[in-house]
Amino acid sequence: MKRRGPIIIIIAAVALLVIAACTLVLTGVIKIKWKKDASPALSKPVAYIEYMHSFMLLDKDLNVTGSETSAPTDIPKVTGLSFDKIVVGSHLDVKNPETAKYAMKLVDCIHKNSLEIAEVYVSADQTATMYVGDIKILMGVDESTEEKMHDLRDFFDDVKGLNGVLDMQELSKNNLGYSFKTN
């Protein structure tokens, strides 16, 4: 027959210590300082990326704010970003930060200029293309981006129902404007 007496005494002693510690905490004799939440402060989603049949929402700082089962219609989709994993409530660690920076700059300009752009694609060589309806908008590299987006706002309503390619990579000769080729 095994002796259980010492084990029971140890368990009882531990229980008494736990009760004493809880009493000291509850009465305020011992104060516990809790570590603040280390997750980033999440803000309103401004874009989304598609990932494993889900639509992951991103804020302006590339924090993943949530996920949806269907594609949002009020914010643009961002494509061209490379990453290993995605965790809701965490910052999206991209392999090419400059590509992500340019993509989010375009997203910011889309919102500032109240444009209805469906998708923003930035390639590894940092050239951007945006899509809306049947229009492909070639933005090129991050050069005069804010000015280009402001120009787009000025004539967006005139072209948004068309089908073709709007080349905004640079102004045409003699600064007459951007070129548009219908399909």
What spans do the regions from the language model cover?
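Charged, solvent-exposed interaction patches on well-folded alpha/beta domains
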Residues: 2-183
